């Protein structure tokens, strides 16, 4: 269970992730960054994958970037107007944030249309301790189903403009792999957040 202080830290991390993911979407929309030729993107509708389907593609690219690359965060979003059925499929484009402990570097790997590539990399001042993914059992469709069943469906019905953000967090201070599912209404400035144990599927409680 999270204390209120730990919960505040998590929310701060998610705000950072949202900024990174917004940058990821901008890069994907503009076709990439960096020197040299930029690979063309598939023409929609492209193949969309769940988190566990997309991860092996991202991991292969990340390990080519740095052999000891480990996943820090996996992120994706569904824009307002997505139906519950679309959410329950749990399939979309993904951004995976990897960290190389030996090189003190991080990179973002995008997976779009079944294609993975590094879109950004750089140094980091501090290397966090990350959990292994061997116990990762709950895929994105299950995480979104849990979100909908724990207030998410009612929240989206009340806030038609809300986007849904889904983040897999692997930092050891969380004690286990955590899915953070967030419905966010920019119009009303409100959010509905459901933290989910990505190993057991249980909703994580917050201690008072």
Describe the predicted segments one by one.
Residues 2-208:
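Long, terminal "pre-/pro-" and other extracytoplasmic accessory regions
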